[in-house]
Amino acid sequence: MNIVILAAGTGKRMRSALPKVLHPVAGRPLLSHVIATARTLQPSRLVVVVGHGAEQVRAAVAAPDIQFAVQAEQLGTGHAVRQALPLLDPAQPTLVLYGDVPLTRASTLQRLVDAARDGRYGILTVTLDDPTGYGRIVRDASGFVTRIVEQKDATPDELKIAEINTGIIVTPTAQLAMWLGALKNENAQGEYYLTDVVELAIEAGFEIVTAQPDEEWETLGVNSKAQLAELERIHQRNVADALLADGVTLADPARIDVRGTLRCGRDVSIDVNCVFEGDVTLADNVTIGANCVIRNASVGAGTRIDAFTHIDGAELGAHTVIGPYARLRPGAQLADEAHVGNFVEVKNAVIGHGSKANHLTYIGDADIGARVNIGAGTITCNYDGANKFRTVIEDDVFVGSDTQLVAPVHVGRGVTIAAGTTVWKDVADGVLALNEKTQTAKSGYVRPVKKKS
């Protein structure tokens, strides 16, 4: 089967320099959703017709299995499909999809393809409570499709028809090429409409078959930012419903955003306003507090992530405790039972089993062993303005508050570092490391007093 995806439109009502089909739903371009669905049907040829912003669109979705046809001048949907004809296998049927209709299920498209087997012409239709503005499907007394009539051309009786044309079709390719060549642009827009092919197929004696989606929203397209927002909420509600069906506890299904793939184990609980991006895995009994952002991360069983935590490109072991207001950046790896508390940032660092950094700390480019306590205000000084260096802290080290570790530096097992120490040399196992300081007390000192105006 050939699949053609129309993605050449200008999208004027989007009021954006970005091509319409590249606007995101759930963190991915509209067109990427359509391509992903198309691939599940295993087409022999997959062609995307580009036009407005063609180079941007190509760059965004280019892949070995995708061919591109160019519609240099925007002359309608029929003209767009015509540009794809040289890339199609004429012996296979062609399914036509739209790059701004992202939520159509693969099962719906398969139903249409199955209905149109043996050389039939298939149309995806949908029945709407309010069909105003759409082309109506007109059937004869036997139920056969006789034509599609546009709103402006419909009779009063035809306007009562609730079944409308979605524009998604499947048809024999050789005949499609012939019909496209016969299209005329005698309309107000001066364009060649793909919908006009239906009448040509009927005149040629082709049987017109239809299929309908399970849900009305599967055929919704995007022409404005308001419609884009509407589809985003529909998609996110679908994701939330699937999570609930899998046993995930959501404090409010209307306040979760999944912009990628979220895999959850048993008894996972997610509070409100959480955003998941990229590829995220939450193991059994994970609890996520409110207002967290988690991107491309794996979270071990029994972990608790408190409110306002940001995690990006990190791996968390089992029973870790993170936040609130913590930040784990790419390369952060936490072993089982590690703690990273409020206003702690970890980047490209390993924190060992049971180690804790509970307050106001920066850990970057570091290897920290097991059972290490990192006091408040500790900083690994990893950057000299040109190069990054690593800090190594062995097992069972106690780091006092307000410590600076100037990398590259190695701290041995069981070391105690006194509060306020700057460590710039390696420290041997088991010692107390401190900077000698003298505390002086002066009598007779008087603090300045503000003068009253």
From Swiss-Prot:
Residues holding acetyl-CoA: A376, N382, Y383, S401, A419
Pathway: Nucleotide-sugar biosynthesis; UDP-N-acetyl-alpha-D-glucosamine biosynthesis; N-acetyl-alpha-D-glucosamine 1-phosphate from alpha-D-glucosamine 6-phosphate (route II): step 2/2; Nucleotide-sugar biosynthesis; UDP-N-acetyl-alpha-D-glucosamine biosynthesis; UDP-N-acetyl-alpha-D-glucosamine from N-acetyl-alpha-D-glucosamine 1-phosphate: step 1/1; Bacterial outer membrane biogenesis; LPS lipid A biosynthesis
Region: Pyrophosphorylase, residue numbers: 1-225
Cofactor (UniProt): Mg(2+)
Entry's Gene Ontology BP terms: cell morphogenesis; cell wall organization; lipid A biosynthetic process; peptidoglycan biosynthetic process; regulation of cell shape; UDP-N-acetylglucosamine biosynthetic process
Top class in the EC scheme: transferase
GO cellular component: cytoplasm; membrane
A Pfam family it matches: Hexapep
Spans annotated as N-acetyltransferase: 247-453
InterPro entries for the chain: Bifunctional_GlmU, GlmU-like, GlmU_C_LbH, Hexapep, Hexapep_transf_CS, MobA-like_NTP_Trfase, Nucleotide-diphossugar_trans, Trimer_LpxA-like_sf
Binding site for Mg(2+): D100, N223
PANTHER family assigned to the protein according to its UniProt record, in alphabetical order: BIFUNCTIONAL PROTEIN GLMU, NUCLEOTIDYL TRANSFERASE
HAMAP family to which the protein is assigned, alphabetical: GlmU
Annotated function: Catalyzes the last two sequential reactions in the de novo biosynthetic pathway for UDP-N-acetylglucosamine (UDP-GlcNAc). The C-terminal domain catalyzes the transfer of acetyl group from acetyl coenzyme A to glucosamine-1-phosphate (GlcN-1-P) to produce N-acetylglucosamine-1-phosphate (GlcNAc-1-P), which is converted into UDP-GlcNAc by the transfer of uridine 5-monophosphate (from uridine 5-triphosphate), a reaction catalyzed by the N-terminal domain.
NCBIfam families per record: glmU
Official protein name in the record: Bifunctional protein GlmU
Encoding gene (name): glmU
